[in-house]
């Protein structure tokens, strides 16, 4: 018997049919450690159990991760200060690789290791944990399924990596961080993103259907392995979670390892080997029905969240009334024409309108300056204000002699100014015109990059 093998047999309904058999001593120790560590991780890592709130997630406060970690955070801070000599805090940045999470994992490892030693000393006569392992595997399978559905719907409804913003099109490639490259590469092809998400959603659904759980584990393992590699190579701050999701897949595969080996080597695979917590035909059916309802509950929540995100900042979001990239052709300040000198810190090169109530000024040195924007289409008035400013940067009237021309006239930074801008034809950008499927291509299309 393999060290990690849980020797069991089940009938076609998933019920145990063989009497309990002794486990390998090393296997018992590894189970105790895995039970403690992965059980604690699923409970204390703030993202694992929140999925089960389903549609109620929309009602949770924005600082729910801090509230979730309120129990473990004092311990984590103490360990960080005492053991690692650093003061850690939970930042609401969306990063899953903050120091506070790494120290949390360290604490869980220490607790699991100490608990394993104590458990082994107090439970030396126990020869197997078949019943307990059945409930443990069910618990982590549900947790894994929730994560697969959550991340899957975020891509299937393409909002996790939205289409590159207009300012992204103006940013030099060398200024991109690796994560920006990955996000833009996926976001430029919503179909590709949706297919990635569909695979993850399918993995989550298969995990929750009793007869397809093994297929769900295998599909989830492939998906999470790819995600983890991308996170590691593009420095995406979800390395810790994606690695643990991949480990959960491997833990779920442990009981099925002999069957998979037999199948891959052309031998009879036999019945499912994963122990089941339900013993009667009736409870098995009730459990299967409950898992189907869980699919509906979780999916409803994530479809709702995805639809809201799609309308808020995805492809279905509202655009600015003056949407587009506007290039300055004439710039007059205090009645004097201002030449387009790269050293001029006050002259504009471009003005970008993308999201409502936002504008971005591109200076002559190509620096991008985000601003708040109030556009009154009735009065043809544009007010711009910096993020930290207490007074308006610009109060300008505007007119459009033609759809592709914009004339601003008013006060800019306390000076009278008149600015004439022409709208950039986004169709001229290879990233926009080169999209789509081309079955016939005489040459590779690298846009303007290769010259």
Regions found by a protein language model. Name each.
Residues 80-111, 189-198:
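Individual transmembrane alpha-helix segments
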Residues 137, 142-146, 277-311:
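Internal/C-terminal transmembrane anchor helices
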Residues 142-170:
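Transmembrane alpha-helix/helix-exit interface in multi-pass inner-membrane proteins
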Residues 121-122, 126, 254-293:
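Cytosolic-side transmembrane helix boundary signature
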Residues 126-151:
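Interfacial segments of alpha-helical transmembrane regions
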Residues 38-54:
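Alpha-helical transmembrane segments of multi-pass membrane proteins
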Residues 294-383:
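Membrane-interface segments at or immediately adjacent to transmembrane helices
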Residues 165-266:
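Hydrophobic alpha-helical segments
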């Amino acid at each position: 018997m393999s060290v990690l093998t849980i020797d069991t047999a089940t009938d076609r309904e998933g019920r145990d049919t063989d009497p309990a058999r002794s486990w390998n001593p090393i296997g018992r120790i590894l189970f105790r450690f895995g039970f403690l560590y992965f059980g604690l991780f699923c409970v204390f890592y703030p993202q694992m159990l929140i999925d089960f709130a389903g549609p109620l997630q929309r009602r949770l406060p924005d600082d729910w991760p801090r509230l979730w970690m309120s129990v473990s955070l004092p311990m984590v801070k103490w360990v960080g200060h005492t053991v690692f000599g650093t003061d850690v805090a939970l930042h609401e940045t969306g990063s899953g690789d903050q120091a506070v999470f790494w120290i949390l994992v360290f604490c869980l490892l220490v607790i699991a290791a100490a608990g394993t030693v104590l458990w082994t000393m107090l439970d030396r006569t126990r020869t197997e944990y078949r019943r307990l392992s059945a409930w443990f595997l069910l618990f982590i399978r549900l947790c894994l399924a929730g994560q697969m559905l959550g991340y899957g719907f975020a891509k299937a409804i393409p909002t996790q990596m939205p289409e590159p913003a207009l300012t992204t099109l103006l940013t030099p490639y060398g200024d991109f961080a690796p994560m920006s490259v990955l996000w833009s590469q996926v976001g430029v092809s919503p179909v590709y993103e949706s297919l990635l998400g569909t695979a993850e959603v399918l993995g989550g659904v298969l995990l929750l259907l009793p007869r397809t759980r093994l297929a769900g584990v295998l599909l989830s393992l492939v998906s999470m392995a790819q995600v983890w590699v991308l996170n590691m190579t593009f420095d995406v701050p979800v390395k810790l979670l994606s690695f643990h999701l991949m480990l959960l897949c491997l833990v779920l595969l442990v009981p099925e390892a002999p069957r998979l080996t037999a199948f891959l080597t052309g031998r009879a695979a036999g019945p499912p080997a994963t122990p089941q917590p339900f013993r009667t035909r009736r409870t098995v059916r009730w459990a299967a029905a409950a898992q189907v309802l869980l699919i509906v509950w979780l999916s409803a929540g994530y479809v709702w969240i995805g639809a809201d995100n799609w309308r808020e900042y995805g492809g279905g979001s509202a655009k600015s009334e003056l949407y587009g990239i506007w290039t300055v052709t004439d710039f007059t300040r205090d009645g004097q024409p201002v030449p387009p000198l790269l050293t001029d810190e006050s002259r504009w090169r471009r003005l970008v309108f993308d999201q409502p109530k936002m504008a971005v000024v591109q200076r002559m040195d190509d620096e991008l300056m985000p601003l708040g924007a109030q556009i009154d289409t009735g009065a043809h008035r544009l007010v711009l204000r910096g993020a930290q400013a207490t007074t308006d940067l610009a109060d300008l009237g505007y007119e459009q002699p033609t759809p592709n021309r914009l004339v601003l006239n008013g006060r800019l930074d306390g000076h009278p100014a008149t600015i004439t801008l022409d709208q950039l034809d986004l169709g001229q950008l290879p990233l926009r015109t080169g999209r789509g499927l081309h079955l016939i291509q005489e040459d590779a299309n690298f846009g303007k990059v290769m010259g």
